[in-house]
């Protein structure tokens, strides 16, 4: 067997072990958060849709935002995040960017097509585009 045939055989073997590429999250673009200040509350109207788009649970995203803002809040039945206190949309958007960089974006290929996996006490980002598995700090 020639070296070229061996090379082709090894490449085929490699490709058979790689995960299949999955459709990307519509061009890596995310919708803008719709943030309203009503009375002494700040409401993120499209919170559930946003969390669905980045493939993360509402509770997990809410926990991160509320922890960063040091404020109480909850996700209501309409899928809106209601935060007690007035906060600027710029500060909430910065917190969401930090969440995406830490818990959503693949550190290898920068794709947003990832899932968060919890194995025992360790948390990992598993990329659906390149197959990388990156450990992250637990929430």
Curated annotation (Swiss-Prot):
Gene3D superfamilies of this UniProt entry?
3.30.30.170
- Matches recorded under InterPro entries: IF2/IF5 (IPR045196), TIF2_bsu_arc (IPR004458), Transl_init_fac_IF2/IF5_dom (IPR002735), Transl_init_fac_IF2/IF5_N (IPR016189), Transl_init_fac_IF2/IF5_Zn-bd (IPR016190)
Work out whether the entry's keyword set contains Protein biosynthesis: yes
Show which residues constitute the signal peptide: none
Per UniProt, which keywords does this protein have? Initiation factor, Protein biosynthesis
Q: Which GO terms describe its molecular function?
A: translation initiation factor activity
Please give the SMART domains that the UniProt record associates with this protein: eIF2B_5 (SM00653)
Say which domain of life the source belongs to.
Archaea
Keyword check for Protein biosynthesis, yes or no: yes
Record's subunit section: Heterotrimer composed of an alpha, a beta and a gamma chain.
Role summary? eIF-2 functions in the early steps of protein synthesis by forming a ternary complex with GTP and initiator tRNA.
What is stated as this protein's family in its record? Belongs to the eIF-2-beta/eIF-5 family.
Q: Which HAMAP family match?
A: eIF_2_beta
Instruction: Tell me what this protein is called.
Output: Translation initiation factor 2 subunit beta
- What is the source species? Sulfurisphaera tokodaii (strain DSM 16993 / JCM 10545 / NBRC 100140 / 7) (Sulfolobus tokodaii)
| Gene that produces this protein | eif2b
